[in-house]
Amino acid sequence: MKKGIHPNYAEVTAKCSCGNEIKTRSTVGHDLNLDVCGNCHPFYTGKQRDVASGGRVDRFNKRFSIPGSK
């Protein structure tokens, strides 16, 4: 391999807002701050909310439906 053309590959720490620290290696060169990680993400913790917002058809039917009819 040629000398001096490859980026520095060093150990960095990714710190989550929940306090979890993940040690990894990267070419970034400094520690990373994360918003969410596997310990606090709603999908992985089971605290996921089900959003039933509907689609375009539901919005159209709601807007142009006749009051009192089903």
UniProtKB/Swiss-Prot annotation:
One annotated GO biological process: translation
GO CC annotations, alphabetized: ribonucleoprotein complex; ribosome
Domain of life assignment: Bacteria
Molecular function terms, GO-annotated: metal ion binding; rRNA binding; structural constituent of ribosome
Assigned keywords, A-Z: Metal-binding, Ribonucleoprotein, Ribosomal protein, RNA-binding, rRNA-binding, Zinc
Leader sequence segment: none
UniProt keyword Ribosomal protein, yes or no: yes
One Pfam family of this chain: Ribosomal_L31
PROSITE patterns: RIBOSOMAL_L31 (PS01143)
Cofactor: how and how many bound: Binds 1 zinc ion per subunit.
Cofactor(s) essential for the protein: Zn(2+)
Family: Belongs to the bacterial ribosomal protein bL31 family. Type A subfamily.
Subunit structure: Part of the 50S ribosomal subunit.
Function in brief: Binds the 23S rRNA.
PANTHER family recorded: 50S RIBOSOMAL PROTEIN L31, CHLOROPLASTIC, LARGE RIBOSOMAL SUBUNIT PROTEIN BL31A
Protein name (Swiss-Prot/TrEMBL): Large ribosomal subunit protein bL31
Annotated gene: rpmE
